[in-house]
Structures are given as C-alpha cells and as structure tokens.
A protein has these predicted regions:
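Short beta-strand and beta-hairpin "edge-sheet" elements
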Residues: 106-150
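Short, low-complexity, polar/charged sequence segments that are solvent-exposed and flexible
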Residues: 31-32, 90-97, 122-126, 138-142, ...
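A short, polar/proline- and glycine-enriched secondary-structure boundary/capping micro-motif
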Residues: 24-25, 84-85, 161-162
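Residue-level detection of beta-strand scaffold positions
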Residues: 69-71, 100-102, 143-145
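Intrinsically disordered, low-complexity terminal/linker regions enriched in Pro/Ser/Gly
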Residues: 151-162
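Short, acidic/charged, Gly/Pro-enriched secondary-structure junctions
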Residues: 83-118
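Charged, amphipathic alpha-helical segments
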Residues: 1, 70-93
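Solvent-exposed edge beta-strands and adjacent loop segments
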Residues: 2-77, 120-135
Length: 162
C-alpha cells in the first residue's frame, strides 16, 4: 500500500559540477526558507497530424515539453537567505567562468530519489511589499537541462532540521 506524503520538510539544494556535463553526486548546499517550488511536470506540446482522411477527430503526436522559462521559487526573505543566495550566485559565476554548470535538487522526505536539474540562477532583487504580511521574495532559476530523478546524496538525508 502506498504511503501518502506531505510537503513538510521539502528542501532545495544546489551544487556545482566537478566534471563538465556531469551532475554532481556530492557537495550540495541547502538553501533555507523555501516556501514553494514550481512544477517540473509540464504537459507535452501536441503537434497536429490530421489529414483530410479524418472524418471526425483531429490526430496528434507528442511534441516537446516546456518548463516555461525561468522557474519561480518563493522564499521568506531573511538575512540568512540573502547571505546564502549571494554565496550561490558567487558559486554560479565561478562555475560559469570554468565552463561548469550549477545543479539544483528538490528533495521530498519519504521519497528515495531527488529531482535534479541544471540551471542558471538570477540575482535577487527587491520584492513587492504590502501592509501586514510576511516579507516574501520570488527567486528565479532558468533550467538548462531536463529534470531527472536520481538517488539522494549523503547530505540529503530525510532528517528534517528545524
């Protein structure tokens, strides 16, 4: 029987390739304060193949999937997030200058595998503010690879630190 899972304890990590083109298998750093992650499960485009022989329905074949450009990750804006995102951006710029990519991992407690994708993060800006609300920010990561499921690394254990 399947065990239903909760979003409690979902975590976001980043790591830099050691060898160009290969997802890192260790050395990931956690980013705290995540409130929401985007869907990495887009519907494929459909390509119409209907001919004049069809009398009632159009026909299609699957096309490419589109993650939609820059992915939105929502965080509580804290001094710790600013420090960690600045460190992430420094690591990204260093990796980019060396011809290496940055990888991101979304870890769900209770699943044996994590969800990985290579991406280019954007610098953090100033979020919208309004009266009597939690200060949140949306940070952006543009995917440069298809998402993959793979085993969690050692630093991605299911223990949830509060």
């Amino acid at each position: 029987m399947a065990i239903n899972l909760s979003t409690i304890g979902v975590r976001l990590y980043y790591g830099v390739e050691v060898t160009a083109g290969e997802r890192p298998t260790s050395g990931y750093t956690r980013i705290f304060g995540i409130k929401s992650t985007p869907s990495l499960n887009p519907a494929p485009d459909t390509i119409e193949t209907t001919t004049l022989d069809e009398l009632e329905y159009k026909t299609y074949v699957d096309g490419l999937k589109d993650l939609g450009g820059a992915l939105e990750f929502t965080f509580n804006l804290t001094e710790e997030l600013i420090t960690r995102w600045d460190a992430l951006m420094t690591a990204y710029e260093t990796a980019k200058a060396s011809g290496l990519r940055m990888w991101f991992a979304i870890v769900v407690p209770g699943l044996t595998k994590a969800f990985y994708f290579a991406g280019n993060p954007s610098s953090m800006g100033l979020p919208e503010t309004s009266v009597n609300t939690v200060l949140e920010i949306t940070n952006y990561i543009t995917p440069v690879s298809a998402p993959v499921k793979a085993d969690k690394t050692a630093e991605m254990t299911d223990s949830v630190s509060l």
